[in-house]
Amino acid sequence: MAANSEKQHLSIVICGHVDSGKSTTTGRLIFELGGLPERELDKLKAEAERLGKGSFAFAFFMDRQKEERERGVTISCTTKEFFTEKWHYTIIDAPGHRDFIKNMITGASQADVALIMVPADGNFTTAIAKGNHKAGEIQGQTRQHSRLINLLGVKQICIGVNKMDCDTAGYKQTRYDEIGNEMKSMLVKVGWKKDFVEKNTPVMPISGWMGDNLLKKSENMTWWKGFDVEVGSEKIHVDTIYDVLDKMCRVPERPVSAPMRMPISGIYKIKGVGDVLAGRVEQGVVKPGEEVVFLPTHTVSNPCTGKVFTVEMHHSRVDFANPGDNVGLNIKGLDKNNMPRSGDVMVYKKDSTLGQTREFTAQIQILDIPNEIKVGYSQLASCAAAVLPAACQS
């Protein structure tokens, strides 16, 4: 539990195909929970209208970059916070466009929960397309993200059948049933266990733009009777996305007493502050005043060390951060000629339990390989927040 909150912390990633309504749903959910003031929403609506994207007002709350707003797509992972009755959430809005899959992996690797979005409009077929490299057919990002979420070890998922208000869906049960059945079948095909999909994965009909079934049960879908989910030995009934987040989701066991480990997902130079490193604490506790090193960038001959000056969560300073907390650290004393890199693991300088190795055993899954794999084949390898080039040697 973070020092500035009485509620335990969970991270949720919102993922799925481009234009499935991820940012809009996220912005609307935070607005409904009181995290987006009316005055700011009015400004976002005006900006969206100016760019000819009137329906993007809620999305603009998450998409802050100029290019994101002009293109109408999420490029980088954006984080915001909100609170349910039980939990303190960090919400990670991941990019859906295939050009930014590396950013999506970085965001999803920090999540405890995933909301996988699929549009109920005409883009549904594209969103879950198998793809075929030889035929030049592109794999749908909802399909690819569903596979990646499984590989990255996210154990709690929910399917959001979004845009139920569109003309194609018309809030009809037949469209929801069609998409729900297709999604369940697809999840099994990309690696999820059938029993888990049937019993532990709610499929929720929603409209992020209109707010249907986000906090309150929709009056536009009177046929919707909710979903019964098995959580351990319990059976939980959920009617809305809020129910899923508050009632269904659980905080995983956190290794608080283990040696501190924090993969670095972002490095920033903030005017008036200095070097700020972002990441998610995986184990142990991060506290100000501690000397740290960044592996594998740090070596005896070329040190990469610093001292934690402050710890912040969502722009608020805290006394410490526990496992599962997404934080920004102001680090003093970094060598400008050997700065930490994204993917480095931060450990305490006094901790000698983590070293470098020349080999390790890993479970590997290959995604989207157009041809056969031969000696010399090069690819990108993703591990936690690190994305590095690799080559097949034998």
Regions found by a protein language model. Give the residues of each.
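Alpha-helical scaffold elements adjacent to nucleotide-binding pockets in ATP/GTP-utilizing enzyme cores
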Residues: 25-29, 40-43, 103, 144-148, ...
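Long insertion/accessory domains within large nucleic-acid-processing enzymes
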Residues: 95, 381-394
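Residue-level signature of catalytic and energy-coupling elements of molecular machines
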Residues: 19, 25, 44, 72, ...
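Conserved catalytic-core segments of large NTP-driven translation/proteostasis enzymes
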Residues: 177-370
